[in-house]
Amino acid sequence: PPRAWAQRHLVHALFYALRTGCGRRYLPREYPPWQTAYTTFRQWRLQGIWQCVHEALRRAVRLRAGRHANPSPAIMDSQSVKTTEESGGIKGYDGGKQVKGRKRHVLVDTLRLLLSVEVTPAKTSDQAGARRLLIGLKPLQPRLELIWADGPYSGDPLATWCAAEGAWRVEIIKPTSHGQGF
């Protein structure tokens, strides 16, 4: 059967919701019905289409910048983010940062392009989050050799695990005299 909405309209609806932060049920009338847009988004996510689009764009940006399509070094960090009582999903309490909410664990290349992201409860340690972030990454990032990280990632257990999981070397970056790491 023919599609009721062109894929371009569906993509525009998804980008509109992403850009404005509007709830999916509040899409303006010029876009497909929210149920259609959400179903399309969900199907594409489950099929890995968004991941493929992201990878293609990231590789294109790297090549345009004169870099290899896949990086050899990367930077790993985390950030605890407050959530509200109404927000659903995973949450916890990060005692070190005094934050009740979620923690984003990210791996970026030297151009600050996202390689991997994992969202956990805020109470998740950086070392445990790093394992969740990196597991299964080797086939997607075959050239990755070096991961720069800050103090919470130091220690032999993570370094040993990284060496075994992906033959990655973890190098801890010390803060400068100004108190900044990255």
Ranges and model annotations:
Residues 1-182:
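Short alpha-helical elements
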